[in-house]
């Protein structure tokens, strides 16, 4: 889990555009965040398995 201070820092607008970085909207994790969903890989996997992301299904080939 991210510290509350880092989540609050991420929620306010950055002074310059280059200072913005992606952070998971659900848990606040800063690494491996998918831009399309704004979720980290762990939260994305949990929501996909629960069927809460429409159109996403487990790959099999």
Curated annotation (Swiss-Prot):
Belongs to the universal ribosomal protein uS14 family. Zinc-binding uS14 subfamily. GO terms for molecular function: rRNA binding; structural constituent of ribosome; zinc ion binding. GO terms for biological process: translation. Part of the 30S ribosomal subunit. Contacts proteins S3 and S10. Binds 16S rRNA, required for the assembly of 30S particles and may also be responsible for determining the conformation of the 16S rRNA at the A site. This is Small ribosomal subunit protein uS14B. Zn(2+) binds at residues 24, 27, 40, 43. Binds 1 zinc ion per subunit. Keywords: Metal-binding, Ribonucleoprotein, Ribosomal protein, RNA-binding, rRNA-binding, Zinc. Its cofactor is Zn(2+). It comes from the Bacteria. InterPro entries: Ribosomal_uS14, Ribosomal_uS14_bact, Ribosomal_uS14_CS, Ribosomal_uS14_sf. One of its GO terms (cellular component) is small ribosomal subunit.
């Amino acid at each position: 889990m991210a510290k509350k201070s880092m989540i609050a820092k991420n929620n306010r607008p950055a002074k310059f555009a280059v200072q913005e970085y992606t952070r998971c909207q659900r848990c606040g994790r800063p690494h491996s965040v998918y831009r399309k969903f704004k979720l980290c890989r762990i939260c994305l996997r949990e929501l996909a398995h629960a069927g809460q992301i429409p159109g996403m299904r487990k790959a099999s080939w």
